[in-house]
Amino acid sequence: MAVSAALSGKYSAPGQGNIYAKANEVIVKITGADTNQTFEVVEENCNPGFQSRAHYHIKAFETFYVFEGSADFQVGVKLVHAEKGSCVHIPPGVPHQVTSKNGVRMLMIYSPAGTEGMFAAMHALTQDQLMDAELTKQIALKHDTVMVEQSSDGRGKGTILG
């Protein structure tokens, strides 16, 4: 009888995992396949001046743990400043956005899993395709993520992909 990846355990060394690097470095340390799609663990190293696009997840809970640096988290109507050692938990349906003036290294846990598919799809896009707001919105939606409009031209502020 074969043992599934979810039952055999996994070790992910520093810098090891599925790496998606565009504006920031995103490393998927534990994939959905490792957990029977229960959750996934992602490390993100954000450059100074980083700002994500405002978005929410339809089904997934998202939890952030800050390892280095700091970031401001807009969670619904509340703004939270998170420094090293801070943890921010966001339930499904709650719009959120992350901004870091000086850079931040954080761990993100998504439950259920599925966000890596968005990272992979966005990583495969050309720079011109990444600027196509409708295309990126559709890719995000396919992976449980709804972009929140922030400007009159329909484009969101910030990056869709770390």
What name fits each language-model region?
Residues 35, 72, 92-117:
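Ligand-binding loop in jelly-roll beta-barrel domains
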